[in-house]
């Protein structure tokens, strides 16, 4: 194909992320949605969310991971996106040398750019904040991002009850 897998970067419930390169030796991250693991009745909603994730990644921002390509491998959709060699924010937690003000500014900049484009992230956590080689923080994983202009309903609330209500049930 167009990309060669370098290594695995991680996996979620229905997807896997790989470091890949194209034939001109540019490095990217490729997120593959593994539909063979998904019950048939939720495949289309997952594909729709994946498509929305790609489109959200097309927003121009220095603090959002950029999406470059979208396609299918044997019927399974993939997104090719910016590769962030610095890992995720969780690796900096507890490090007293971390420039917290700069990270906060980057994260808030990404959230602001999402909001200016009518989006909310809805899954902000250290694992979804990646670091570029120069230390710039960028937001990623827009899979459950939503349209901030649409009314919230119980169908689009994500998380465990104790996370939503602030209790440990």
PLM feature spans:
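Conserved N-lobe ATP-binding subsite of Hanks-type protein kinase domains
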Residues: 16
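AlphaC helix of the eukaryotic protein kinase fold
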Residues: 39-58
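Activation-segment/catalytic-loop signature of the eukaryotic protein kinase fold
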Residues: 70
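Conserved short submotifs of the Hanks-type protein kinase catalytic core
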Residues: 74-88
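AlphaC helix of the protein kinase catalytic domain
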Residues: 88-97
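Activation segment signature within eukaryotic-like protein kinase domains
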Residues: 103-104
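Protein kinase catalytic-loop region centered on the HRD/HxD motif
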Residues: 109-119
């Amino acid at each position: 194909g167009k990309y060669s897998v370098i290594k695995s970067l991680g996996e979620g419930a229905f997807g896997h992320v790989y470091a890949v390169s194209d034939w001109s030796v540019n490095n990217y991250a490729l997120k593959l949605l593994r539909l063979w693991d998904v019950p048939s009745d939720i495949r289309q909603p997952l594909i729709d969310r994946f498509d929305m994730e790609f489109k959200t990644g097309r927003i121009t921002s220095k603090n959002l991971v950029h999406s470059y390509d979208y396609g299918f491998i044997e019927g399974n959709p993939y997104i090719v996106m910016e590769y962030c060699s610095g890992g995720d924010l969780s690796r900096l937690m507890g490090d007293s040398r971390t420039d917290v003000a700069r990270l906060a500014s980057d994260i808030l900049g990404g959230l602001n750019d999402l909001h200016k484009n009518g989006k909310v992230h809805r899954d902000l956590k250290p694992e979804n904040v990646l670091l570029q080689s120069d230390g710039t923080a960028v937001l990623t994983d827009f899979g459950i991002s939503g349209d901030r202009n649409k009314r919230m309903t119980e169908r689009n609330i994500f998380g465990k009850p104790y996370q939503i209500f602030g209790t440990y049930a």
